UniProtKB/Swiss-Prot annotation:
Tissues where this protein is expressed: Highest expression detected in brain and some expression detected also in uterus, stomach, ovary and intestine, with isoform 2 being expressed at the highest levels. In the brain, isoform 1 is highly expressed in the strata oriens, radiatum, lacunosum-moleculare of the hippocampal CA1-3 regions and the dentate molecular layer of the hippocampal formation, with lower levels detected in the neuronal cell layers and the stratum lucidum (at protein level). Not detected in tongue, thymus, spleen, lung, heart, liver and kidney.
GO terms for MF: guanyl-nucleotide exchange factor activity; phospholipid binding
Record-level GO BP terms: neuron projection development; regulation of ARF protein signal transduction
Listed name of the protein: PH and SEC7 domain-containing protein 1
Family note: Belongs to the PSD family.
Length: 1024
């Protein structure tokens, strides 16, 4: 809602609307022009002169001034009249917007013009219409009429009240003849573009210098005596020439007019003691930047009486032809300011010359004795770029005559793209009392803009600077705010600099000056709902990676997201822990809502932890996993408040179980944590006390007997299974696996869907030792029948018989064994079952396999060793450490990139290195008796070196046989190996191939379970 303010002198009365004017009294003129899209703001002022009633019984003196539009070229299109059938009264014009209207009540005073021009009549209609009239008598003012008027500063009005009272002439209402002004050396001006005639050009720069700023320092109030002093005339002349240029053209050769000192009346006041009616601040650099403005006055009563002449004035605007009987001024007179046209008849020169400044203000003055015989001269016509279309809001009884006339004047004499409300509300306005405020505030509803074609932009002569000369002290806060707004919107309005707005009436009220046709910034086009939908809402709608720290918590969104995470609706198990482990309020809410789906009532801590870990894959960094466990501990304590003393105690015990699980079932070779160690580590951590020993013993036994299993991502598992069945996959995934293993992350299986199948057949498996040769629990040592498939470097164990192309199940995939750097040997020391062979993997797990026959056993041993020798990549160098503790190096599971010959040479080099290191190790400890942990480490290293020597010897011998056979068929290699045992040269088969010729030992010796003796000497293993 735009707002307007009305200010008037507390000593004078305000304008009361006259009797209502019938609609038929309004002038019926031609169809006005349509306002351009960029003209929308204006300021209207009302001026009242204390005079008697008019000849028609109407109260005179209700006038309007000034009205300032935005500068824009006239629209070439014609729009229907607002009173026509196409635009009913009360409807806003297309593209119109609400603006601020300032109604100013100023008691007019007669100001004598310069050079003896008649001024007793004040501002006359002859000046308004471009003609000159004779002076007329003015009734004497009463004692209360000679008042000081306090004017409201408006940036749209460059001259204060009375500033435009330097007049060329006046007209007596009782006489018709017009008295022309004195033109030449004694004339103040001849023809101004707004009906005032042009100004001589030799005074155009008279008051442009910095030295003339003294005229600008004026007071806030001024008196209006009957006889104007010379000081007042000089001030008026200075203001006029400052805003509109000098009044004499240098080409005319005339001298500047001399001021006529009027005789002072008895009641006149000294001019030196009079303050001028508005405070204006100028700087020396702003004098040349003040845009020129022209005034125009029209009497409301005369417009009512002479509506035909007013209509003819509008008709003459686009055609540059005035009505018959109008006075034509000299055509050679130049215009002091870039007005609508230098000839005052055409509206196109403004566009052609690129003048950015339109006629900003008009002053409409009431005069007595209006006669219909007076005509508006061609030179005095106001060039209105576009007509003003009214969007009135009539009262219940309809608009009164004053409102109608005011609207008619604004429509017919000014070009506005602004919609005004009806002035019928002024009827209730009365003279302010001593205690009443001199301001009246009202609101006008904004009018919705309609799409309009953009008018052609004029070519500006120079960039228009803000009118600093028209800013008063009262406008300071508004002007400062406007400057801030313009600085913020500078980037947006930069492309439309061809349509600058010199109107400051909107600026003083903080209204934007953006053209109607301009598009809003891109930031305003973004929907607020999109900006309010933060990342948490978008995550709840399906996104999985939009959470970040500091997001605002939303309980409803957290509940929706937790429900979807629990049901895995659009999420995977691997995504759950990531969303629960974030360190922000929203993730905490999500975790709390997610844990509400779990009911741990009556469960022990380890049981609840197993149930919880089956639903999500606990992944991420340590702090993220710790946050997830904290949410679990909180929920467990809520369900079992009697089981533990506090929530912190539950969290401490949960983390202790996770560490115990890693220590007992991890890949470390050191000493395992005992039950006593576990209890001792938790002393004093239960809120300063100890946990019950029975509880800790039960938890230790549970974790030791059955490790905590993390959930496996089903999506990744299904993708891996499909890749095993797909012969031509595009993506190869790594799947943790290993029968009876701990799903070590260091020993991932790399399925090779395109790998060849080297052998398949029935096998019976038994897990003999877990990684690092740890003894397998008795409950997991049983024999199980499978159908083995050697595909690539992976031995798959299926429940059913092998069918090419059939996908493996989850359990079958978990039973898969990687054979990289593995060695298969005949189990000659195992006598419980026939045709049994050992398979030791890279992580030192030991399996026993029983084949249906001896031939099948030898075939499985040969093919497993050949495939391992062909594709096992060279190992990385051993780790360097300052400790004497032995640690086996990790062996790569990827396939080698070496050629067959390079692979053979690598195996032979490693064989020599292992043999040399084994001799050094035995020599170093010869004759020394080690005890305890040191003796165990010596035995572990010696067993490792013996196994590696045997493995690399077997690999090198098998690859030599394969290269000699010059065939990729394993059947051919098996036949060649069988012949190598009875060759003519007497060369025995490789001693490192126990599957071909195992050699029994003569003296067995007790060994640690899972260890081996020296290569080639046989071994004695404890029977499981």
């Amino acid at each position: 809602m735009a707002q307007g303010a009305m200010r008037f002198c507390s000593e004078g009365d305000c304008a009361i609307s006259p009797p209502r004017c019938p609609r038929r009294w309004l002038p019926e003129g031609p169809v006005p022009q349509s306002p351009p899209a960029s003209m929308y703001g204006s300021t209207g002022s009302l001026i009242r002169r204390v005079v008697g009633p008019g000849p028609r019984g109407r109260d005179l003196g209700r006038v309007t001034a000034p009205c300032t539009p935005l500068r824009a070229p006239p629209s070439p299109h014609i729009a229907p009249s607002p009173w026509g059938p196409s635009s009913p009264t009360g409807q806003p014009p297309p593209g119109a917007q609400s603006s601020v209207v300032i109604f100013r009540f100023v008691e007019k005073a007669s100001v004598r013009p310069l050079n003896g021009l008649p001024a007793s009549g004040g501002l006359s209609r002859s000046w308004d219409l471009g003609g000159i009239s004779a002076p007329r008598p003015t009734p004497a003012l009463g004692p209360g009429c000679n008042r000081k008027l306090r004017l409201e500063a408006s940036t749209s009005d460059p001259l204060p009240a009375g500033g435009g009272s330097v007049l060329p002439g006046s007209r007596d209402p009782s006489r018709g003849p017009l008295v022309p002004p004195q033109i030449g050396a004694d004339g103040l001006y001849s023809s101004l573009p707004n009906g005032l005639g042009g100004t001589p050009e030799h005074l155009a720069m008279h008051f442009r210098g910095p030295a003339d700023t003294g005229f600008l320092n004026q007071g806030d109030t001024w008196s209006s005596p009957r006889e104007v002093s010379s000081h007042a005339q000089r001030i008026a002349r200075a203001k006029w020439e400052f805003f509109y240029g000098s009044l004499d053209a240098p080409s005319s050769g005339a001298k500047p007019p001399e001021q006529v000192l009027p005789s002072r009346g008895v009641g006149s006041k000294q001019g030196s003691g009079v303050a001028v009616g508005r405070a204006a601040k100028y700087s020396e650099t702003d004098l040349d930047k003040v845009p020129l403005r022209c005034y125009r006055e029209t009497d409301i009563d005369e417009v009512l009486a002479e509506r035909e002449e007013a209509d003819s004035a509008i008709e003459s605007q686009p055609s540059s032809e005035g009505p018959h009987g109008t006075a034509q001024p000299p055509a050679s007179r130049p215009s002091p300011c870039p007005g609508p046209s230098s000839s005052l008849g055409s509206g196109n020169e403004d566009d052609e010359a690129g003048g950015e400044e339109d006629v900003d203000d008009e002053v409409f003055e009431a005069s007595e004795g209006a006669r219909p015989g007076d005509h508006m001269p061609h030179s005095g016509l106001l060039k209105s770029p576009v007509p003003f279309l009214l969007g009135t809001s009539p009262s219940a009884d309809g608009p009164d005559s004053f409102s109608c006339v005011f609207e008619a004047i604004l429509e017919s004499h000014r070009a506005k793209g602004t919609s005004y409300s009806s002035l019928a509300s002024l009827e209730a306005l009365a003279s302010p009392g001593p205690t009443q405020s001199p301001f009246f505030t009202f609101e006008m509803p904004p009018q919705p803009p309609a799409p309009r074609p953009d008018p052609p932009a004029p070519a500006p002569l120079a960039p228009l600077e803000p009118d600093s000369g028209t800013s008063s002290a009262a406008d300071g806060p508004w002007t400062q705010r406007r400057e801030v707004e313009e600085s913020d919107a500078g980037a947006t309005l930069a492309p439309r600099k061809e349509l600058p707005s010199p109107s400051h009436s909107e600026d003083s009220f903080g209204l934007g000056a953006a053209p109607l046709g301009s598009e809003p910034p891109l930031s305003q086009l973004v929907s607020d709902s999109d900006s309010e939908l933060d990342s948490t809402e978008r995550l709840a709608l399906g996104s999985t990676d939009t959470l970040s720290n500091g997001q605002k918590a939303d309980l409803e969104a957290a509940q929706r997201l937790a429900k979807r995470l629990y049901r895995l609706d659009g999420f995977r198990k691997a995504d759950v822990a990531r969303h629960l482990g974030k360190n922000n309020d929203f993730s905490k809410l999500v975790a709390g809502e997610y844990l509400k789906f779990f009911v741990f009532t009556g469960m022990t801590l380890d049981q609840a932890l197993r149930v919880f870990l089956k639903e999500l894959a606990l992944m991420g960094e340590t702090q993220e996993r710790e946050r997830v466990l904290a949410h679990f501990s909180q929920r467990y304590f809520q369900c079992n408040p009697e089981a533990l003393s506090s929530e912190d105690g539950a969290h401490t015990l949960t983390c202790a179980l996770m560490l115990l699980n890693t220590d007992l079932h991890g890949h470390n070779i050191g000493k395992r944590m005992t039950c006593g160690d576990f209890i001792g580590n938790l002393e004093g951590l239960n809120d300063g006390g100890d946990f019950p020993r029975e509880l800790l013993k039960a938890l230790y036994s549970s974790i030791k007997n059955e490790k905590l299993q993390w959930a496996i991502d089903e999506e990744e598992l299904r993708r891996s299974l499909s890749e095993l069945a797909d012969p031509n996959p595009k993506v190869i995934k790594r799947v943790s696996g290993g029968s009876g293993s701990s799903s070590s992350p260091f020993l991932d299986l790399t399925p090779e869907p395109g790998a060849a199948v080297y052998k398949h057949g029935a096998l019976v498996r038994k897990v003999h030792a877990d990684p690092d040769c740890r003894k397998t629990p008795r409950g997991k040592r049983g024999w199980k029948s499978f159908h083995g498939i050697l595909k690539g470097m992976i031995l798959y164990l299926q429940k059913e018989e092998y069918q090419p192309g059939k996908a493996l199940s989850e359990a079958e995939l978990k039973n898969a064994i990687s054979i990289h750097h593995a060695l298969a040997t005949r189990a000659s020391d195992y006598s419980k079952r026939p045709h049994v062979f050992y398979l030791r993997t890279a992580d030192w797990r030991v399996f026993l396999f029983q084949a249906p026959s001896l031939e099948q056993m030898q075939s499985w041993i040969t093919r497993i060793n050949v495939v391992a020798a062909m594709f096992s990549a060279p190992p990385f160098p051993a780790a360097v450490s300052s400790q004497k503790k032995f640690s086996r190096p990790l062996l790569p599971s990827a396939a080698t990139r070496l050629s067959q010959e390079e692979q053979v040479r690598t195996h032979e080099a490693k064989l020599k290195a292992m043999a040399s290191e084994l001799r050094e190790h035995r020599a170093a400890h010869l004759g020394k008796k080690a005890r305890g942990k040191e003796a165990d480490e010596q035995r572990q290293k010696e067993a490792y070196l013996e196994f590696e020597k045997s493995r690399y010897g077997t690999y090198a011998a098998l690859l030599r046989v394969k290269m000699k056979a010059a065939s990729e068929e394993l059947d051919t290699i098996e036949a060649a190996l069988a012949q190598a045992g009875s060759t003519e040269d007497g060369c025995p088969p490789p001693h490192s191939s126990p599957s071909l010729r195992p050699k029994p030992t003569s003296q067995p010796r007790a060994q640690r379970p899972g260890s081996e003796t020296r290569a080639g000497a046989g071994s004695t293993r404890p029977k499981p």
